[in-house]
Amino acid sequence: MPRVTSATWKYESGAVGSLMHVIALHGRDFFTEIDVFADGYSLRLCDAYNAPVLYVRRPGDDREEVYKYDDDDPFFSEVAGMIDAVEDPSQRHRILTSYDDAARTYAFTWAIRRASEACVAARHHSP
């Protein structure tokens, strides 16, 4: 499927990260899910851009805790946090990441894309 990106990497700390991005659903609405796994933990954020629901499983407990965030607009919250911090320096805590981290994340997504494109090109040129 040409609209799929999948990447797995290992951090210097030894932790493993992975990303899958797929554009495959038909229709107007789209589906988003973010999964985070750590030793004993599972966090799953579903429908992040419409009616976000966070499912949390903790070490030693098979139950999933469910947190619903009605009427949450992550794009609005992100921009509002930045504007509030510019207008009132006491609100800087609302910015949850540094510009440097954001720039490195963006560069990382491009590295994933370039590696994927190089892989596809190599497949087309192999005997």
Annotate each language-model stretch with its function.
Residues 28-33, 54-59, 65:
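A short, polar/proline- and glycine-enriched secondary-structure boundary/capping micro-motif
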Residues 31, 74-77, 107:
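Generic recognition of short, well-ordered alpha-helical interface segments
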Residues 1-50, 79-89:
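Contiguous beta-strand/loop segments that form the cofactor/metal-binding neighborhood of enzyme cores
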Residues 68-80, 97:
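Active-site loop of classical SDR/Rossmann-like NAD(P)-dependent oxidoreductases
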Residues 12, 81-127:
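C-terminal helix-rich "cap/oligomerization" subdomain common to oxidoreductases
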Residues 17-19, 63-65, 95:
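Short beta-strand segments
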